[in-house]
Amino acid sequence: MKLNRLIPMLPVRNMPQSVAFYQKLGFRIEQRKDEWRWAMLCFGECRLMVDESINPHPDVPRSSVVYLYPDDISEFHAQARRNGLSVPDLETTFYGMTEFRIDDPDGNRLWIGQSRSAGA
């Protein structure tokens, strides 16, 4: 037996606002069901779902962390800035990554990085 795929589903307060945020990061809409308040986003082979209906405490900040691994962290970072997101400068970590961290509109933390050995 094997696990074929794992897709995070993040609880959000406002699905359209969250979709717009992730589009600025370079994701595109694969599926969207406004009547469900749900969307599936993709970036290459990676998938992410956002869903209003699974947020049992809409006034409480989220504490999820999703780590994204682009193949070119510098270009991904520049794209996020070009698309109007306020993102911190890239940092080189003690654990060998070049990365930056941001929160989506619902407080879900995104760590976005590339291994220094991968050329970043």
Model-predicted regions and their roles:
Residues 1-17, 64-66, 115-120:
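N-terminal beta-strand motif that seeds the catalytic metal site of vicinal oxygen chelate
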Residues 56, 95, 116-119:
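A short acidic/small-residue loop/turn micro-motif
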Residues 28-34, 91, 117-120:
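Conserved catalytic-core motifs of GNAT/GCN5-like acyltransferases
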Residues 6, 35, 62, 96:
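Exposed loop/turn and edge beta-strand positions of beta-sandwich/beta-sheet ligand-binding modules
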